[in-house]
Amino acid sequence: MYIAGVMSGTSLDGIDVALVRIEGSGVESKVELIHFTTVPFCNDIKSEIQQALSIENSNVQLICSLNFKLGLCFANAVKEVCKEANFSLEQLDLIGSHGQTIYHQPKQDGNRIPSTLQIGEPAVIAYETNTTVISNFRTMDMAAGGQGAPLVPYSEVILYRDPSKNRLLQNIGGISNVTVIPNQQSDQNVIAFDTGPGNMIIDEVCQRLFQLSYDQNGEIAKQGRVVDEILTYCMSHPFLKMNPPKSTGREQFGEKFASELLKRFEKHSKENILTTVTMFTANSIVHHYKKFILPYYEIDEVILGGGGSYNSTLVEMLRNGLKDENCAIFIQEDIGYSSEAKEAIAFAILANETHHCNPSNVPSATGAKQSVVLGNITFPPV
């Protein structure tokens, strides 16, 4: 089957689309990446998404309209990846669309029950592409008592499980998450959970202090030094003390967190603040390894993915934090994969599993009561 996986993450970089060919289903699936592209959001759409993400500034009319606008954006992104690949849209069998997360409530909070909302109307995508769309992957896991995240572990087992090596797959997107993949001979469980911020706070600080959307290759962070009092403040966040399975998002590490941090520590230089929040991402990852993974698993390799793997300052901080742990550290490209395409490929794989009526959540990662088939299916008009 030819499937387009569509992902718009918490970093708001744009729409990632992976065109893949998949043979079979389940752990024996054969997955081939044909082409990958990122279609940037136009400024107006990005501004509307940012407004929709803000509890103070959002409204139901905006979210209702944006749901359909994003559906059209996602459809156009699918057309673009096919055009770039010189691939006929008519040959496409399926689209797996994650959607744009507007709010994610993984745990009960007063009268707010666990819930999640991703928008990007699948009916619009199906109509515009004349292709079956599978979307809303997180909701069934949450209905089964899970946190709806992380969902990539299933695809990571298919792509990365090794005959003899125990691997950690560390994604550094807006939020960071890790998947522990024991080797094929092991009887240990696959586990996965969010480790805290990825690029989200780094990008927010960059935008506010340097008027840049991100710190390219970590060049600015390389110029500063870590401020202990800021790092201590960051590392005291309650999320770091929680036991897995757990997930987090913009609600904990987004605009509000960055605003409070910058106000509290405004006396420090811009460069030092950026260096310190970069170290916070690295330290929060290392903290979770040492507390929840390394005491129980012997890890041979750590494989980094997501946009944060291109931040050489962040990667060097991670290497230093793990230098005594006797594990090799790679980025996706080192082993023949794409850091950028990883999550879009994952949702193509999940769409394929749903098409075959296979459960594809990992209860040991999400906390769900059982394995479930993920996603809603929207058929094209004819």
Swiss-Prot record:
Q: What is its EC number?
A: 2.7.1.170
The protein's matches in InterPro entries, at most eight in alphabetical order, are given as: Anhydro_N_Ac-Mur_kinase (IPR005338), ATPase_NBD (IPR043129)
Q: Which reaction does it catalyse?
A: 1,6-anhydro-N-acetyl-beta-muramate + ATP + H2O = N-acetyl-D-muramate 6-phosphate + ADP + H(+)
Q: Does the keyword ATP-binding apply?
A: yes
Q: Where does ATP bind?
A: 9-16
**Quick check: keyword Transmembrane helix in the entry?**
no
PANTHER family documented for this protein: ANHYDRO-N-ACETYLMURAMIC ACID KINASE
- What protein am I looking at? Anhydro-N-acetylmuramic acid kinase
Identify its protein family.
Belongs to the anhydro-N-acetylmuramic acid kinase family.
Q: Which Gene3D superfamilies does the annotation name?
A: 3.30.420.40
Q: State the CDD domains in the record.
A: ASKHA_NBD_ANMK (cd24050)
Database matches in Pfam families = AnmK (PF03702)
Q: In which pathway does it act?
A: Amino-sugar metabolism; 1,6-anhydro-N-acetylmuramate degradation; Cell wall biogenesis; peptidoglycan recycling
Any one GO molecular-function label of the UniProt entry: phosphotransferase activity, alcohol group as acceptor
Q: State the UniProt keywords alphabetically.
A: ATP-binding, Carbohydrate metabolism, Kinase, Nucleotide-binding, Transferase
In terms of NCBIfam families, this protein maps to: PRK09585.2-1, PRK09585.3-2
Q: Known SUPFAM superfamilies for this protein?
A: Actin-like ATPase domain
A Gene Ontology biological process annotation?
amino sugar metabolic process
Its organism's taxonomic lineage begins at: Bacteria, Bacillati, Bacillota, Bacilli, Bacillales
Determine the domain of life of the protein's source: Bacteria
Relate the protein's function as given in its record: Catalyzes the specific phosphorylation of 1,6-anhydro-N-acetylmuramic acid (anhMurNAc) with the simultaneous cleavage of the 1,6-anhydro ring, generating MurNAc-6-P. Is required for the utilization of anhMurNAc either imported from the medium or derived from its own cell wall murein, and thus plays a role in cell wall recycling.
Q: Where is the signal peptide?
A: none
